[in-house]
């Protein structure tokens, strides 16, 4: 039988609840989300439960990672459905702050990540994004003080940036990546998929097919540049506006020219209509 999670809306309330768990020798896993939860998020919660004895899920649509032209105001907010999903998974605490709790009046500090994970992918097209992500995740880590934090591999560059930040700042949190959950036709689950029209939803599967085709060609010995050019052409022909479609080193995100350069990851970002989709797969 599921139970309702404790809902914390202020930092002191969250810390009291988390401290009470620690007093009982609990280990804590944090699952940061922006809400609009789907089965991909549920998979993160289930991984968190396997890694720790107690689970905290944060729901906060973070304004600092959106540019003025992006979809902060329109981002789906489904609070009642989210809580029902989390209760069904026996989540212990839901951290649901308002903007004023995360960024009170006078807030003036920002974490700006640098280094190899800033590899000219999302950071090239959304230069504001990772500063906003690093700042809010850094705050979530210091507010909750979890032992583990679970992030989806769908946002692969974000996973690398957050892992680097936690290590560099000695935050004492082990960041764990969770495999991307897909629809039956291969589309990566995303809260933004609700923006797609029925026709766009059918077309959106092109991203996964193009990645799989390019990955297969690379494994078969085709030159990376050739295989990636084929995939990019397929995506554009389907009607996408392509931001990037690249093969990178899976650990460092450095550019590669040969399979011998190390384990590879194909990453893509493209806009279909008004909806921007991102995805990635291992080669």
UniProtKB/Swiss-Prot annotation:
Main localization category: cytoplasm
Protein name, as recorded: Pantothenate synthetase 2
Active site: 41 (proton donor)
Biological pathway: Cofactor biosynthesis; (R)-pantothenate biosynthesis; (R)-pantothenate from (R)-pantoate and beta-alanine: step 1/1
Role noted for this protein: Catalyzes the condensation of pantoate with beta-alanine in an ATP-dependent reaction via a pantoyl-adenylate intermediate.
Family according to the record: Belongs to the pantothenate synthetase family.
GO MF annotation: an example: pantoate-beta-alanine ligase activity
UniProt-listed InterPro entries: Pantoate_ligase, Pantoate_ligase_C, Rossmann-like_a/b/a_fold
Gene Ontology terms describing biological process: pantothenate biosynthetic process
Misc remark: The reaction proceeds by a bi uni uni bi ping pong mechanism.
Enzyme Commission number(s) of this protein: 6.3.2.1
Subunit architecture: Homodimer.
Top EC class of this enzyme: ligase
Keywords: ATP-binding, Cytoplasm, Ligase, Nucleotide-binding, Pantothenate biosynthesis
Reaction catalysis annotation: (R)-pantoate + beta-alanine + ATP = (R)-pantothenate + AMP + diphosphate + H(+)
Binding site for ATP: 34-41, 152-155, 181, 189-192
Cellular localization per UniProt: Cytoplasm
The keyword ATP-binding is assigned to this record: yes
Residue sites binding beta-alanine per the record: 65
Residue numbers binding (R)-pantoate: 65, 158
HAMAP family referenced in this protein's UniProt entry, alphabetically: PanC (MF_00158)
Protein's organism: Bradyrhizobium diazoefficiens (strain JCM 10833 / BCRC 13528 / IAM 13628 / NBRC 14792 / USDA 110)
GO cellular component: cytosol
Species classification: Bacteria, Pseudomonadati, Pseudomonadota, Alphaproteobacteria, Hyphomicrobiales
């Amino acid at each position: 039988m599921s139970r309702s999670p404790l809902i914390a809306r202020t930092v002191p309330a969250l810390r009291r609840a988390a401290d009470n768990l620690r007093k009982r020798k609990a280990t804590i896993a944090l699952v940061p989300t922006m809400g609009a939860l789907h089965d991909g998020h549920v998979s993160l919660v289930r991984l968190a439960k396997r890694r720790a004895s107690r689970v905290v899920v944060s729901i906060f649509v973070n304004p600092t990672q959106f540019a003025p032209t992006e979809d902060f105001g329109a981002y789906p907010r489904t609070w009642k459905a989210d809580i029902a999903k989390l209760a069904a998974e026996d989540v212990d605490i839901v951290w649901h702050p308002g903007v004023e709790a995360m960024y009170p009046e006078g807030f003036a500090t920002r974490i700006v990540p640098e280094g190899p994970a800033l590899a000219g992918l999302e950071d090239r097209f959304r230069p504001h994004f990772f500063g906003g992500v690093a700042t809010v995740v850094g705050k979530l880590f210091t507010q909750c003080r979890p032992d583990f934090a679970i992030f989806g591999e769908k946002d692969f560059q974000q996973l690398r940036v957050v892992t680097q930040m936690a290590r560099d700042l000695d935050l004492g949190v082990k960041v764990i990546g969770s495999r991307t959950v897909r629809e039956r036709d291969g589309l990566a689950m995303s809260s933004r998929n609700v923006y797609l029209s029925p026709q766009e939803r059918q077309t959106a599967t092109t991203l996964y097919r193009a990645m799989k085709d390019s990955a297969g060609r690379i494994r078969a010995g085709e030159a990376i540049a050739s295989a990636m050019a084929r995939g990019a052409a397929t995506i554009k022909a389907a009607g996408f506006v392509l931001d990037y479609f690249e093969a990178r080193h899976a650990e460092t995100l450095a550019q590669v020219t040969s399979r011998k350069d190390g384990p590879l990851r194909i990453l893509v970002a493209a806009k279909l209509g008004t909806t921007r989709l991102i995805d990635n797969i291992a080669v």
